[in-house]
Amino acid sequence: MTRGNEKEEAPPQAKILGSFPTGIAPYAELMRVHRLLGFYLNTSPYLVGVAFCASISPTKIPITVLLHRTILLSIWSIFLRSAGCVWDDLIDMDLDSQISRTRTRPLPRGAVSPKNAFLLTVTLFACGGSVLIYLPWPCAVDCLIITFFALLYPFGKRFTDYPQITLVNIGWAIPMAMHSLGLDPLSQMKPTVCMFLFIGLVIIMIDVIYSRQDTEEDLKVGVKSMAVRFRESIELLSYSLLYASTGFLAMAGFFTGLGLSFFVVSVGGHFCGFWVLLKATRVGNSYGVESYAKSAFFLATLFWLFGFVIEYCLRN
């Protein structure tokens, strides 16, 4: 997903990477510890999922329980994201070596061996999965589903123009958050599906915008993606994803009977925040994309959370 598209133009120079010992820095770079956008994209769906559950639960969920689940799910998402980055680079090593923005990554430049990268992937997934012992058993099934699609993602760009579709699985954070709090997604099927699709479409939208930076080189190498497939109509695609995601978020609020504050703060904040992102990046320019995306996604997450938190407070 966005994990696979967090490109680097030079060997690790970021201050955060410089704080690691020389032998560890390439592994930290491989895990993208210095690229915050990926952490935002993978962690915020779980935060939103917990807030969503709190606002629709028929009984009040204690704040201590909400904080406990938030911490555990955040830990899981951080390890998931890091493992996904390593796995993507391992599978894409031959392609990354042919693209200027990625050929300086640890694997193409030989700073990390494929064997060590594989072992790191397994270790990270295992560490993330360890939090499941503190969560209800249905979360283990959710974990397996999310992990399966995370492993599948890097293969998609070799065989289909729509590898970003697998990123919809990040929206599975919603049912996982519900299971962690003892709520049954099937009893709230319509809003759960809407929230799932909302998260998935937002992730796809950002990934498409980010992937656009390398469209020309991807065409030469043979990398497939929606950014390549719709390179002549990338603006139409991006705005369509924005409108669709806004619609699904609004429908989730409608099906659960959320109030005006949710629609003004969460839905309105989401639309305005990403509309500004699309305008600022002009939907195809590479300059400043990551910086704009980080700011827009961070602010949008705050709007999503504030709307749900207000509803939680009003209902309780």
Swiss-Prot record:
Biological process, per Gene Ontology: terpenoid biosynthetic process; ubiquinone biosynthetic process
Pathway(s) the chain acts in: Secondary metabolite biosynthesis; terpenoid biosynthesis
Keywords tagged on the record: Magnesium, Membrane, Transferase, Transmembrane, Transmembrane helix
Effect of inactivating the gene: Drastically reduces the production of andrastin A.
Membrane topology value: Multi-pass membrane protein
Annotated transmembrane regions: 36-56, 60-80, 131-151, 163-183, 191-211, 247-267, 294-314
Keyword GTP-binding among record annotations: no
Name used for this protein in its record: Prenytransferase adrG
Organism: Penicillium roqueforti
